[in-house]
Regions:
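Ser/Thr/Gly-rich low-complexity blocks that favor extended beta-strand/coil architectures
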Residues: 218-248
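Sec-dependent N-terminal signal peptides
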Residues: 4-14
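A structural "domain/chain start" motif
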Residues: 18-83, 194-211, 283-286
């Protein structure tokens, strides 16, 4: 009995350490942004074609470099919105500062543009309504702060099919940049997920686990509706092996480090593992 208790305590201690190490905050230093729009060489033919397109469709697309600082701010917001990422805007500098970062983030902006269209109307004095869409395309480079090695180069593109027509240019830009921040934040959450463990059973049937409590909550940004995978961890020859056993969904965040979850798959196996007193880990998937 004493041996079993010691073993259980050791397993729980390993679980807390394992999850805690993986939930460390990632510090990002946002550095250099370059604006390099992809513009083809204009010929007489292409110019005439553009004019014809405007006349036929009533739409015209224009690069808007004056919004590049707004794009930068949107990216910083997105990077900071991740579960485990905090971004500091270092300005357009190349040298290191006294601050310590895990990674630097540089970016290339290849598109900041708006498309306008006009429609005839009887509700305005000039008989025309103008509407706007804003598009943006960027590539981020995550670089090791010690070696400058590029470890990831995600691309984000918001095209005209991703946004709706809006009545002012500024509102169109704001809407698109809000979407850009969300895309960047989602990328960070997938790259740097949060980890936890199942605390205890909440509800079960004869042979299947239905609901559980986990040790993730508001302190790491867990929210109602967040999906997670559940798995066990074994160490073989000094290497971790993860075995997925099910999927969970947070139904209610009940505190800084506790949430109530519904088991969506793997209920039978999860119950068997919990009945043995073994630790089950969880990881966010979105």
């Amino acid at each position: 009995m004493r041996s079993s208790i010691i073993t259980l305590v050791l397993l729980l201690s390993i679980g807390v350490s394992w999850a805690g190490d993986r939930n460390r905050i990632i510090a990002l230093g946002v550095r250099n942004f370059t604006y390099t729009p992809k513009e083809g060489k204009e010929t007489v033919g292409s110019a005439l074609g553009s004019i014809a397109s405007v006349l036929i469709t009533g739409q015209n697309t224009t690069q808007q470099p004056q919004y590049k600082d707004a794009v930068r701010a949107a990216i910083v917001r997105g990077l900071t919105s991740g579960f485990r990422t905090i971004a500091t805007d270092m300005g357009n500098i190349g040298e290191q500062t006294n601050a310590t970062f895990d990674y630097y983030v540089d970016a290339t902006i290849n598109n900041i543009s708006t498309t306008t269209k006009t429609e005839s109307t009887t509700t305005t004095k000039n008989g025309v309504n103008t509407y706007y869409k804003a598009m943006v395309g960027i590539t981020l480079q995550f670089k090791d702060s010690q070696t400058e090695e590029v470890i990831a180069s995600p691309m984000f593109k918001i095209s005209d099919v991703d946004v709706a027509w809006i009545e002012t240019e500024e509102s169109a830009i704001t809407s698109t940049l809000r979407k850009l921040s969300a895309y960047v934040g989602r990328y960070c959450n997938r790259k740097y997920p949060i980890y936890g463990t199942i605390l205890e059973s909440a509800r079960q049937s004869k042979d299947k686990q239905k609901e559980v409590y986990i040790d993730l909550g508001t302190n790491l940004g867990a929210y109602k509706g967040l999906h997670l995978t559940a798995y066990t961890v074994k160490t073989i020859a000094g290497k971790e092996t993860k075995i997925q056993v099910g999927k969970l969904k947070i139904m209610d965040v009940q505190g800084e480090d506790i949430s109530f979850c519904k088991i969506q798959s793997g209920g039978k196996e999860i119950k068997n593992i919990l009945d043995k007193g073994e630790t089950i880990f969880v990881k966010s998937t979105e």
